[in-house]
Amino acid sequence: MNSSHQSKRLIVLVGSPRRDGNSATLAQAIMAGAAEAGTDASLFFLDDYINGFLVDERHATPPADRYGELFLEHFLPAGAAVFCTPLYWYGMSAQTKAFFDRSFSYYSSAYPDAEQVHQRMSGKRIGLAVASEETYPGAAMGIVHQIQEFSRYSHSEFVGLVHGAGNSRGEISRDPRNPLQAARELGREIFTRPYSDYRMDTPRSPQVWQN
């Protein structure tokens, strides 16, 4: 499945409580890159929309928050999504994880429009930006694997990863690996970056990069 049926809208989701922290700084760089490409992009802080976790809706009502608005009105219509999260205990933040967990309320068979939700969840271009205190390359692999498997499960394309290091607010700008430039490029190229994920029977050219 490809993303040809999706719009060219980008949604950037920040799973940090800090509006001026390193995850938010990465998100702003992604937004700047999207603006350079003329991409319609919107940024959302997850804790403005999520204030509770997934519940057993057979016996309890969902949290009275704005998650449904975020998921149905902003995430589903977007053709691309970039998740920006700090590294907490070698995983994504609780806000970010709750975004995925809460979606079950809308794609489970109990939801009247579940089939439509399935279709609109699929075929997106997915990116990930992680801010951590550690420069250890393996620190973020748990998050990377989760986003990779979400993309696979939803027939989406995981097209880019940015991992930057910083502790104090904005310190990520001093990371010599220049993650802010990488984030800017991810935002600029979210709909154009080449993507390949071969299987044994995938038709392919003998060249990766065409002239």
Set out the residue ranges of the language-model regions.
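Short histidine/acidic/glycine/proline-rich micro-motifs that form metal-
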Residues: 17-20, 133-137, 167-170
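Beta-strand-loop-alpha "switch" segments that mediate conformational coupling across diverse proteins
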Residues: 160-165
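A short, mixed-charge helix-start or loop-turn motif at secondary-structure junctions
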Residues: 12-13, 64, 129, 133, ...
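N-terminal beta1-alpha1-beta2 submodule of the flavodoxin-like/Rossmannoid cofactor-binding fold
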Residues: 1-108, 112-113, 173, 177, ...
